[in-house]
Amino acid sequence: MRKAIIAMSGGVDSSVAALLTKETGDECIGATMKLFHNEDIGVKREKTCCSLDDVEDARNVCYRMGIRYYVFNFSERFKEDVMDRFVDAYEHGATPNPCIDCNRYLKFDKMFQRMRELEYDYIVTGHYARVEYDEEKNRYLLKKAVDDTKDQSYVLYMLTQEQLAHISLPLGGLRKTEVREIAEKHGFVNARKHDSQDICFVPDGDYAKFIEQYTGRKSIPGDFVDTEGNILGKHKGIIHYTLGQRRGLGIPAASRLYVCDISPKTNQVVLGNNEDLFHSELTATKVNLISCESLKEPMRLKAKIRYRHPEQEAVAWQTEDGVLHVRFDKPQRAITRGRQLCYMMEISL
């Protein structure tokens, strides 16, 4: 019998993942990560995925299944590796995805550390993705979920071979409707609970307000400029804008204007036409290849530059410095600094 830690958010997905793992006969405990105190960032407890209500939902599910339940306090690490990184990225003109950092530094790092300390064998999560071992390649592969509408392989791109060897994703072969049916059948209190949509520590979606409150610093106004460098007006501070943004610019023009670039060095926001947002190439650093050690030669693949972005045909190659270069068959809109690139070879990453 192996021993598993179930990472539980209080939602239906992780609850069903816990149930399916328990049904294998393995020893299980449920664990919720305490990431921050809501009052510290000025939000009500019921508005985030880290609320007391969520903890109680997870505890209730574990009680019904007869497994022990714990709350691990990772708030200090969350502040350093997720919230601080989020703020720093926005202040430098990038658009980060903090959910990926949370997976990287908390769920699949800090939780792994706790797993080893408790002498457990693997971690279970409610992500919609699949892990399979390829004997020919002698590597674990990360594959897309059966339910394309819920696939979360994009947010797991950073997983190492060691981590892939010690995780289980029971929902990868199920559809969301099936997961809810299982939860209802077993009387889970969260069977019809809505999925979380927003960044947990910015539930109202106002990133600029959060950053100002979190840092205690007011935004520094600067210039809107066109693609030729001509001043068009004043902006409220670069943290208020992201690439591709059209609304809230307050600049009169004969045609629609969009944010085409953000320069933290000059504190300028570049505005242009929609056509100015399209580019065919990008470079990516901090590369994590799952299906191979490195790209020895150019490779045809499908890539996506955002979580909900459709996969696009492209060719990729890696230079000696480890940087990944990607050229898309068709120009892509708003390739944004700070975002993650995920590529697929057939259904493997």
Residue ranges and their predicted role:
Residues 126-349:
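AMP-forming adenylation/ATP pyrophosphatase catalytic core
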Residues 1-157, 168, 178, 184:
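ATP-dependent adenylation/nucleotidyltransferase module used to activate substrates
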